[in-house]
Amino acid sequence: HDALPISGLLDFLIFKVDNRVEDVNLYGDIYIKKIIAGLLKKFLIGCQNMMRECIELEGSGFPVPARYEDIKNMVRGYLGFGNKMGEGWLLTGEMLELIHSGVSNIVCTQPFGCLPNHIVGKGMIRAIRENNPSANIVAIDYDPGTSPVNQENRLKLMLSTVKRVLREDSPAGSVAGNEESSSLLIHDNVI
């Protein structure tokens, strides 16, 4: 069983540091912030590169995560880099990274009524689907007041779409009841 790509904490840390650089670029903040944030970003990207090299060399079966700058470039045309509420543009970038790496079925969970992630996450799903017709993305809220039945129904609806697509793409009868081959990935966003 191949491991599926899941973004790590390091991308989020680089994103937070990079936001300080973008603040200076977009809003004209204190220039020393840009220098310090730039140095920290360079250090974190160096750590990411070492991690990528180790994963490649070890042959562990884990996919090598995309570079932060590659994820950032995927977002161009979707969102501006000044959009940093919640996970900001990174959430959209993570979904695009999954799609580009072959994962077309994504469950985007939104815990605790996080309004920024609702806006950015759910708001970008339509644009992502328009540019990536094979994308099957569902956003599910996990709040104390959210009905588990609604959550389960959204997952069942998504799985029915997966089954339909697999039937259309496969020889007759070869997909019956085989949800495991659908490359479903549950993606958990926690802020």
Residues of each region from the PLM?
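Short, conserved secondary-structure transition motifs
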Residues: G8-D23, G145-N150
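Active-site rim loops that border cofactor/substrate pockets in soluble metabolic enzymes
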Residues: I36-T92
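Short, structured secondary-structure boundary patches
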Residues: V21-K33, I128-E130
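Extended, charge-rich low-complexity interaction segments
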Residues: G28-S60, K163-I191
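Hydrophobic alpha/beta core scaffold segments
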Residues: Y68-E168
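Aromatic-residue detector
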Residues: F12, N49-E53, W89, D143, ...
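Generic signature of intrinsically disordered, low-complexity segments enriched in small/polar residues
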Residues: F15-D18, K34, L115
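Short, small-residue-biased leader/transition segments that mark boundaries at the very start
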Residues: H1-L4
